[in-house]
């Protein structure tokens, strides 16, 4: 009798994706983050579902419903903090995953890469609307500041902002619709993940050398299933340590103050994972210019495959590109730090220089370095 996993229409799909999938024999731990992101998504949907059972999306009760979850619901505090810190783990894995893609040239798989950038945008949107839901000070003012950026769009801006708000300010209508968005987006993300995997399995995985591994592939199971389980255990350990020892380490104390439209917090800033983009937004003294820079700082990832000039796919054997890559990482860390600082000197000028360097590296320096390396190959 033929094996059911090779004949059954549904099981066959799973078999070809997770069991008999031919995988390069030399992929490193940097290839673990895809499965970790899948795990993060599952954790977020599960904890989010239980939170939604007790949360009320209404301005008068939202804040107290979150307090009620933490105080009165069985293990509600655990579910709430797993969900909050799960978002941080999600972004850590996302940024590692994107960094791996940039370093090893995974962006050469155009469709997979573009769906991945769409996924990044969807996760960022989900995190933003989710941050508004506890209805603390930073929730309210974050929503006000970020939605207000749309008013920079010529002609239709103000109308657009009022349409998104559902009124003339961030209020009950805004909170209700943001809850609806926050609930639906993870399912859209799940669908996109399936498309992401579909395109990936058309070509097979890349590997650290950037060379085709068709002649040296091994089955995904048991080799990479066990490797993914190890990665998952390490991530869960990190997440539980963070959640159980320092649950508020990455949060903002201002969000423990109920939202008050009459009182603006001293420093309005987003969660840590948006700080680099926030720093780029603030570094341009013009509203529309800042909004465009903010948008382009993420959308620039769509251009990466087109800016590819190197003859070698991976940066493994390209020291000049490696140097620029790590400068880019240092620059992003600098931007993250600047985003958390007040708008005053010397932070303003450092932020402007770091923002300029970010675009310069991706658009000019890295493609130029690749061309120089191509020349060196001919020596």
From Swiss-Prot:
Protein name: Cytochrome b
Classification of source organism: Eukaryota, Metazoa, Chordata, Craniata, Vertebrata
Cofactor: record remark: Binds 2 heme b groups non-covalently.
Keyword Electron transport (UniProt): yes
Species whose genome carries this gene: Pontoporia blainvillei
Binding site residues for heme b b562: 83, 182
Any one biological process term the GO annotation gives: mitochondrial electron transport, ubiquinol to cytochrome c
Record membrane topology: Multi-pass membrane protein
Keyword annotations from UniProtKB, A to Z: Electron transport, Heme, Iron, Membrane, Metal-binding, Mitochondrion, Mitochondrion inner membrane, Respiratory chain, Transmembrane, Transmembrane helix, Transport, Ubiquinone
Gene (UniProt): MT-CYB
GO molecular function: metal ion binding; ubiquinol-cytochrome-c reductase activity
Known partners and oligomeric status: The cytochrome bc1 complex contains 11 subunits: 3 respiratory subunits (MT-CYB, CYC1 and UQCRFS1), 2 core proteins (UQCRC1 and UQCRC2) and 6 low-molecular weight proteins (UQCRH/QCR6, UQCRB/QCR7, UQCRQ/QCR8, UQCR10/QCR9, UQCR11/QCR10 and a cleavage product of UQCRFS1). This cytochrome bc1 complex then forms a dimer.
